[in-house]
Amino acid sequence: MCGQHGGVLYARKNMVVSDYAGGGLSLGEMGQAAYDYLLFGDIAILKVRNGWGDVVDLVPLPALYVRRRKDGDFSVLQKGPPLIYSARDVIFLRQYDPQQQVYGLPDYIGGMHSALLNTEATIFRRRYYHNGAHTGGIIYTTDPNLSDEMEEDIAKKIEESKGVGNFKMMFINIADGGEKGVQFIPIGDAGVKDEFANIKSISAQDVLTAHRFPSGLAGIIPTNGAVMASPETARDTYRKDEVIPLQRMFASAVRHDPEVPPHLHLQFEGLNSDGLPLTKPADNEIVITPGDGV
């Protein structure tokens, strides 16, 4: 996974969880639910019942293994027979997908090619240095005095030059050999053809754009004298536009299930019992509460 892609997913999850004030999910379970929702595009929350059929707890199911059945029920794949849960026992949240209404579609899907390109560029550069800081080449021999034993020794030394300890010299002595009896022909020049820095920079920015995540919160260093907004300003704006809507969606989905008792409703700081943002009175507004003697 691309470093920016994975890091932003965790940052978005942490922002959602940072305001969690309690409810039917523990702090860890809330983080699991938020992360699965962001990563896979959907999350199934199981309503745990007691012997009388009352809902007494909430548990997020692992989104990677959750499947929806034709009859509307849910199954969780595992080693052995799958676990089957009735549709009435599951609160299912999903991101909208215009092509199908079964599973959710992650909102970052448009940036996956950039995330993969970023990863492949890193892997290519790692292999380049692991191979001895070159992209490979051809050992071309034309000297008739080169014996079969010497050819085998050269091939063995070349193979041993890869990986750890790859900076080695090779001595070849061919009696009466020609000047160009042994030649190394490089296949390519990574320094010229591999635009590593540009690929990493552009693809990383594409990933942040796909997540709508501020560069100032992602650790991006400004280049060419560029100036970024302060992290506090970026965080406040992102929280208002991206984090609070997710918190409201989670809180609303649980609150509007008639079987979930109020003490299991998900509570977030800054949101009231209805999942709406708390409003502050205007500076010139006078708030009168009982007992003020007015």
Residue ranges and their predicted role:
Residues 1-65, 190, 227, 231-235, ...:
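Flexible, gly/proline-biased loop segments at the beginnings
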Residues 38, 54-59, 85-91, 179-184, ...:
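Noncatalytic linker/hinge segments flanking ATPase motor cores
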Residues 41, 86-87, 92, 133-135, ...:
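A generic structural signal for well-ordered coil/turn residues at beta-strand boundaries
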Residues 47, 78, 94, 141, ...:
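Pocket-edge structural micro-motifs
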Residues 51-104:
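Active-site and NAD+-binding cores of ADP-ribose-processing enzymes
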Residues 64-66, 77, 157-161, 188-192, ...:
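Short, low-complexity, polar/charged sequence segments that are solvent-exposed and flexible
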Residues 73-80, 102-111, 280-290:
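Short, surface-exposed secondary-structure junctions/capping segments
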Residues 98-279:
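A contiguous, surface-oriented mixed alpha/beta subdomain in the mid-to-C-terminal portion of proteins
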